[in-house]
A protein has these predicted regions:
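Short, small-residue-biased leader/transition segments that mark boundaries at the very start
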Residues: 1-2
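Amphipathic alpha-helical "lid/sensor" segments that cap RecA-like P-loop NTPase cores
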Residues: 10-68, 79
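Accessory nucleic acid-recognition modules appended to NTPase machines
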Residues: 46, 50-226
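Nucleic-acid endonuclease domains
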Residues: 162, 213, 241, 296-301
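Structural motif
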Residues: 226-230, 257
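Domain-level recognition of nuclease-like catalytic cores that cleave nucleotide substrates
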Residues: 264-301
Length: 301
């Protein structure tokens, strides 16, 4: 998306160097990229929408096209599902934005069906996930590997597969606030969604951790054998992260990287790395060794 808007390869080279070496991004470049990131949130990644923006730079046209796509999604749900299943899928889809807007962002089934049972809705969530329309992030009992064995499948957040579509599904015209740089606490759900989208597209599974004792970590990511902790901060107080501090202090828990994505510039304080939001593009899977030779010594047999 950035390249489609004319960002040069030399800029990406500079950014990658800053990311890998914990160097500050030049101020003018940093401020411009924050604006481009806000544009990416609003426009999203749907090819036709991106092309419309590149051709016209008309946010009104972008939003109208996004709302047409949302309507096409609803038509697809009607076309490719039947009966009660169709009703459930539509109810889930239409509630994603409002559920994310809640304080803890967790998907609460009884908000769409007072007598609903998760086992009756499981296939509906799977339908939306398999279609790439929605991205579930599951809570874990503890932020340790292997995360898949620690998942609590009945506790999850449900993100929209494309953040531009999430913005378009919010009827308050928040696009203009975002483009003005007003990424305050009320935009936290939008910001968290774009990170879920980016992390998932990087090939990672989505998990989070929440407990009364430690608080909540936005993303707990299994990266190879290590567990990375990611916090997404929308405000100016991004160096306040009590849950991250508490979890990091648990003696028996071992972690890889501890990253805070924020509006600030690149910085490292002890073991916590601070990166601007737009640098999520450089957060990638650990490279696996090309060869791993293992042979048992049989000489003692």
């Amino acid at each position: 998306v950035y390249k489609r808007q004319g960002v040069q390869d030399t800029t990406f080279t500079t950014l990658q160097f800053c990311y890998e070496n914990h160097n500050e991004v030049p101020t003018v470049m940093h401020e411009t990229l924050l604006k481009l990131f806000a544009t990416y949130i609003v426009v999203g990644g749907m090819p036709d929408v991106v092309q419309t923006y590149v051709d016209t730079h008309d946010i009104g046209k972008v939003v109208r096209l996004q709302r047409n796509i949302l309507e096409l999604y609803r038509q697809d749900i009607s076309k490719y599902s039947e009966g009660a299943e169709k009703v459930r899928i539509k109810a889930i889809f239409d509630s994603i934005a409002s559920q994310l807007d809640d304080k803890n962002r967790r998907f609460i089934l009884n908000r769409i069906d007072e007598n609903g049972r998760m086992n009756r809705y499981e296939n509906s969530f799977m339908w939306l996930s398999d279609a790439g329309v929605a991205l579930p992030s599951y809570n874990v009992t503890e932020p340790q590997a292997p995360l898949q064995l620690n998942e609590k499948r009945n506790l999850f957040k449900l993100f929209m597969g494309d953040t531009g579509l999430l913005c378009a599904s919010c009827m308050e015209n928040i696009q203009f606030e975002l483009l003005q740089g007003n990424m305050d606490v009320n935009m936290g759900s939008i910001l968290e969604n774009v990170f879920a989208q980016s992390i998932k597209s990087g090939g990672f599974s989505l998990n989070y951790f929440e407990s009364k004792k430690y608080g909540e970590l936005d993303f707990v990511i299994q990266n190879g054998l290590k567990i990375d902790l990611l916090e997404i901060k929308s405000g100016n107080d991004y160096q306040k992260h009590s849950a991250l501090n508490k979890v990091s202090a648990v003696e028996n828990w071992k972690f890889g990287r501890k990253i805070v994505f924020c509006k600030g510039n690149v910085e490292q304080k002890e073991e916590i790395e601070y990166f601007p939001w737009y640098m999520v593009m450089f957060y990638q899977r650990e490279k696996e060794p090309e060869h791993y030779i293992y042979e048992v010594d049989l000489s003692d047999l």
